[in-house]
């Protein structure tokens, strides 16, 4: 059975890594970043719910008087 020749593997792997690095650098360099990022204003509008207008009391079964 012939022996597998691995002498060119290191060159192949290194060239593949270099190519991937260059491709990713080119892809990232085309992305436009905002020059002056500013925080978004997080203002929320308070909505009135119908149950906020009236007072309600919730009785739990354990707090009811014994009968």
From Swiss-Prot:
Location of N6-acetyllysine modifications: 54, 57
Topology term for the membrane: Single-pass membrane protein
Subcellular location: Mitochondrion membrane
Keyword Membrane (UniProt): yes
Alphabetical list of InterPro entries matching this protein: ATP8_mammal, ATP8_metazoa
Keyword Mitochondrion found: yes
Biological process annotations from GO: proton motive force-driven ATP synthesis
Coiled coil: none
GO MF, one example: proton transmembrane transporter activity
UniProt modified residues of type N6-succinyllysine: 54
Disulfide cysteine pairs (residue numbers): none
Any one annotated GO CC term: proton-transporting ATP synthase complex
Keywords recorded for this protein, A-Z: Acetylation, ATP synthesis, CF(0), Hydrogen ion transport, Ion transport, Membrane, Mitochondrion, Transmembrane, Transmembrane helix, Transport
Domain of life: Eukaryota
Residue intervals passing through the bilayer: 8-24
Record-stated family: Belongs to the ATPase protein 8 family.
Function: Subunit 8, of the mitochondrial membrane ATP synthase complex (F(1)F(0) ATP synthase or Complex V) that produces ATP from ADP in the presence of a proton gradient across the membrane which is generated by electron transport complexes of the respiratory chain. ATP synthase complex consist of a soluble F(1) head domain - the catalytic core - and a membrane F(1) domain - the membrane proton channel. These two domains are linked by a central stalk rotating inside the F(1) region and a stationary peripheral stalk.
Subunit annotation: Component of the ATP synthase complex composed at least of ATP5F1A/subunit alpha, ATP5F1B/subunit beta, ATP5MC1/subunit c (homooctomer), MT-ATP6/subunit a, MT-ATP8/subunit 8, ATP5ME/subunit e, ATP5MF/subunit f, ATP5MG/subunit g, ATP5MK/subunit k, ATP5MJ/subunit j, ATP5F1C/subunit gamma, ATP5F1D/subunit delta, ATP5F1E/subunit epsilon, ATP5PF/subunit F6, ATP5PB/subunit b, ATP5PD/subunit d, ATP5PO/subunit OSCP.
Name of protein: ATP synthase F(0) complex subunit 8
Organism: Felis catus
């Amino acid at each position: 059975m012939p022996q597998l020749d691995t002498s060119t593997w290191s060159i192949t792997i290194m060239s593949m890594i270099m190519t991937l690095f260059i491709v990713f650098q080119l892809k990232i360099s085309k992305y436009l970043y905002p020059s002056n990022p500013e925080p978004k204003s997080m203002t929320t509008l308070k909505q009135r719910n119908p149950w906020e207008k009236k007072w309600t009391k919730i009785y739990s079964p354990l707090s009811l008087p014994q009968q």
